[in-house]
Amino acid sequence: MLAKRIIPCLDVTAGRVVKGVNFLGLRDAGDPVEIARRYNEQGADELTFLDITASSDQRDIILHVIEAVADQVFIPLTVGGGVRSIADIRRLLNAGADKVSINTAAVTHPEFVQQASEHFGNQCIVVALDAKAVTPENDRWEIFTHGGRNRTGLDAVEWARKMQQLGAGEILLTSMDRDGTKAGFNLPLTRAVSDAVNIPVIASGGVGNLQHLVDGVKEGHADAVLAASIFHFGEYTVDQAKQAMRAAGIEVRL
């Protein structure tokens, strides 16, 4: 059994790490290079770096920040935000990213995922799904784009399957209902997507304590768990998270 991964997430806008609730109300969490270095030292398995306003205001990705982060970090680095072309992916990989996350462009041009996968190999293509419940029972979820502002009408589980078929090597699944709330992952959503595909699924959105990370793996069937605010603001360290997962019988790299 593969070890489950713990992945701190750096949401970056205007060169600063920020954290909001339900994609709004952003709070400054610090300098991305300093934060990335700290997580590297704490033993994070990977880092995810999302330029959260790149798609919505059509800004080019801040390559100099990525280069500075990649220079300090010796664990796999996934970078996303405003990725719209093969040239964008090449620039990010050249700047030091190990994997590139495609979100809005996967919806507007699904064939782009296939082109990217054929060009660079599916091991470095992550498709990010921002999903939100569209029923009161929390049993159906749809994909939203542009930082959660645009509803697409696409069913999240079906979309994950399609992305796998087109060559995604990994799914980064964010529950927008839970993002920043600290109420825990949306476990029915996480489980439905994880069980529908046979590529790794990273659960994101809602972590408020270490038990939530455990639940994401045990109940959500996720291959990796991503968190931001519990790490950024010093509530827990990555090592504490790994110890909690290990105590719950989950294999992790210590």
Curated annotation (Swiss-Prot):
Pathway: Amino-acid biosynthesis; L-histidine biosynthesis; L-histidine from 5-phospho-alpha-D-ribose 1-diphosphate: step 5/9
Disulphide connectivity of cysteines: none
UniProt-annotated catalytic positions: 11, 130
Assigned GO CC terms: cytoplasm
Reactions performed catalytically: 5-[(5-phospho-1-deoxy-D-ribulos-1-ylimino)methylamino]-1-(5-phospho-beta-D-ribosyl)imidazole-4-carboxamide + L-glutamine = D-erythro-1-(imidazol-4-yl)glycerol 3-phosphate + 5-amino-1-(5-phospho-beta-D-ribosyl)imidazole-4-carboxamide + L-glutamate + H(+)
Annotated SUPFAM superfamilies: Ribulose-phoshate binding barrel
Transcription regulation listed as a keyword: no
Alphabetized CDD domains for the sequence: HisF (cd04731)
Location of this chain's protein in the cell: Cytoplasm
Keyword tRNA processing: no
GO biological process, one term: L-histidine biosynthetic process
Assigned keywords, A-Z: Amino-acid biosynthesis, Cytoplasm, Histidine biosynthesis, Lyase
Enzyme Commission numbers on file: 4.3.2.10
One Pfam family of this chain: His_biosynth
Superkingdom per UniProt: Bacteria
GO molecular-function terms, A-Z: imidazoleglycerol-phosphate synthase activity; lyase activity
Principal place of residence: cytoplasm
Family affiliation: Belongs to the HisA/HisF family.
Quaternary assembly: Heterodimer of HisH and HisF.
Functional note: IGPS catalyzes the conversion of PRFAR and glutamine to IGP, AICAR and glutamate. The HisF subunit catalyzes the cyclization activity that produces IGP and AICAR from PRFAR using the ammonia provided by the HisH subunit.
Name used for this protein in its record: Imidazole glycerol phosphate synthase subunit HisF
Native source species: Chromobacterium violaceum (strain ATCC 12472 / DSM 30191 / JCM 1249 / CCUG 213 / NBRC 12614 / NCIMB 9131 / NCTC 9757 / MK)
The gene coding this protein: hisF
